[in-house]
């Protein structure tokens, strides 16, 4: 979530509603004015609450800038303090506007509940927000274009990922498909969760349909999911080719699979990272961990190919990461 940009859009949209008729050029100028001084346009509990949340998230990220310099015990203690401060910020945001959906979402995620308890909490948040009936595609046919609908999309994304983590693969797929239907642009990444769920369900037809929909937009989730799916179906020659494609798509993809690295909580949604970069590979492997755990020989099979092992080891040497 780009909180600062969304705060600008929220404030500008509410101010346009008060002004009445405003041309596109006029709205663009209004957005520039809001960006110069957002605080001057925060004129309701709704916007004040969102601004408080954005500040809390910014503080959480700034406080973790030097985490790499800490030893394990220091890191755990510092991270616990940061999460507690973030939770306090969410509580403050909710005291300003109890309807701030993003604050409720972040509060649940920051509690680091297990997948079952987290899903219960997220579904409770959704229920309190009025359920899916309130989600509108708007005039453009994409809910993402309405900045006030984005919190609901982020909530659905978190529900889908939590379902995947908790081995509720059909529910993860259903919610992900709902996300893609509500927002075809899919900024939240429902297609990514769907790819992994389809792989675990061994739904080759559904996976191929998703692949066709994303034609020309390859990503690490899709390529890793394809490799797992074909491996589970026992087509080993095709699985080997898919593994090679996965390894060649993203920088450090082999290392990410063979030596999984720590991934911080998504607060509140999956961070945007450069396509084809190492972070994309680490995110995909992290989200696929519950599926990979169900296929215990998959990683050792991948590691058995000298070219794949060498790619991972080479990336380790280039970056200085542990091997």
Regions found by a protein language model. Give the residues of each.
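TPR/TPR-like (Sel1-like) alpha-helical repeat modules
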Residues: 122-132, 177-184, 212-220, 230-255
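Residue at a conserved register position within TPR or TPR-like alpha-solenoid repeats
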Residues: 59, 107-111, 163, 198, ...
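Residue-level recognition of tetratricopeptide repeat
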Residues: 48, 86, 93-103, 169, ...
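Flexible helix-coil transition and linker loops at the boundaries of alpha-helical arrays
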Residues: 39-45, 90-98, 124-149, 180-182
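Extreme N-terminal leader/anchor segments
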Residues: 1-86, 92-95, 243, 308-323
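Long, ordered, amphipathic alpha-helical scaffolds
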Residues: 228-323
